[in-house]
Amino acid sequence: MRHAKSSYPRGFPDHIADHDRRLAPRGVREASLAGGWLRTNVPAIEKVLCSTAMRARETLTHSGIEAPVRYTERLYRADPDTVIKEIKAISDEVTTSLIVSHEPTISAVALALTGSGTNNDAAQRISTKFPTSGIAVLNVAGRWQHLELESAELVAFHVPR
């Protein structure tokens, strides 16, 4: 999931660090819609990996998703390999996880993990644009630690509005 819409306060970027930008009112609304969609359309989330950026943390809070969270600086300005390493470190006891991160990385990760059985419409939409609050749903067979490129099935892409 990409973080929800953030605000650009007066004086940005000099006035406030990018890491500390908060959600815009639209982002608060979209994060809530995203959480509702996740609760309705995917199995219960058992683990969340979330960027330490304020907008990512606020996205998670306003989504209402309640699961153990690991906030990690590594997801802020991460490259796809770093995000995949973080996913591979998830405990095998976890069957459903949520990653709250940033663009352009989150779309690159979703597409890099996408393999056979993929929803081609969803993949095309992700490659065109991964808007704020966008959610890519992937099925991963096997253990997290064995996750490889092109090994997951992209089953849905949703943008709450």
Swiss-Prot record:
Disulfide pairs?
none
Keyword Hydrolase carried by entry:
yes
Specify the domain of life of the species encoding this protein.
Bacteria
Keywords associated with the record: Hydrolase
Name the enzyme group at the top EC level: hydrolase
Q: Which GO terms describe its molecular function?
A: hydrolase activity
User: InterPro entries recorded for this chain?
Assistant: His_Pase_superF_clade-1, His_PPase_superfam
Enzyme Commission numbers on file: 3.1.3.-
Q: Which family does it belong to?
A: Belongs to the SixA phosphatase family.
This protein is called what? Answer: Uncharacterized protein ML1117
